[in-house]
Amino acid sequence: MKLYRDEAVVLRTHKLGEADRILTLLTRHHGQVRAVAKGVRRTSSKFGARLEPFGVIDLQLYAGRSLDVVTQVDTLAPHGRSIVGDYALYTTATAMVETAERLTEIEREPATQQYLLLVGALRALAERAHAPTLVLDSYLLRSLAVAGWAPTFTDCARCSREGPHRAFSAPMGGALCQACRPPGAAAPAAETFLLLGALLAGDWALADASDERHRRESSGLVAAYLQWHLERQLRSLRHVERA
């Protein structure tokens, strides 16, 4: 396979030499791909502006030994234009693409569900369909679920006892009954558990109707759950403006 086409989200870029950029892409069919875009930093470049983070693109690449080479680009959804000018949207989108990069670290391993989740989340941000923090927390929960780390917010994560329950532990997988609850477990409000379940399921009517107190509490639990499974903190998450 020398030349191939795919859709992609630009996760990250950095400069190479005087005129080139190295791109980290999450593609629809080929997973995470690293590629060089030659000459895109020149003002005469035909597609430099199309290769900014958060954009959804259709591109043709030449498969190289270490880095692929971008040979053609078309814009499918210029979400970056709507996102980069708004601090809340920008920091939220940055946390999303950093998460996507971490969850798809094995290059060229297909990750179509992760790609589709990210595209949908970026679209929701760009269209301001919901509060940015809700979109972020929903994306984080669902992307972790796709990666095999789905939390439970109703039945006990340890013994499967039917809920609802009032304790939460990120290391143990979510909600816990009184018998399984370890010392120091969080005790979120019942409304927070409902919100978390709605965000995981994509129940936007319930999520949009939630109040700020429960949004803040749910965001803290989502961040703890994410950090536990990624085994490190997202650099970008600390900059996100929480409700």
From Swiss-Prot:
GO biological process: DNA recombination; double-strand break repair
Keyword DNA damage: yes
Disulfide bonds: none
GO CC, one annotated term: bacterial nucleoid
Domain of life: Bacteria
UniProt xrefs under InterPro entries: ARFGAP/RecO (IPR037278), DNA_rep/recomb_RecO_N (IPR022572), NA-bd_OB-fold (IPR012340), RecO (IPR003717), RecO_C (IPR042242)
Gene3D superfamilies noted in UniProt: Nucleic acid-binding proteins, Recombination protein O, C-terminal domain
Keywords: DNA damage, DNA recombination, DNA repair
Pfam families: RecO_C, RecO_N
NCBIfam families for the chain: reco
Similarity comment: Belongs to the RecO family.
Role this protein plays: Involved in DNA repair and RecF pathway recombination.
Protein name stated in the entry: DNA repair protein RecO
Species the sequence originates in: Beutenbergia cavernae (strain ATCC BAA-8 / DSM 12333 / CCUG 43141 / JCM 11478 / NBRC 16432 / NCIMB 13614 / HKI 0122)
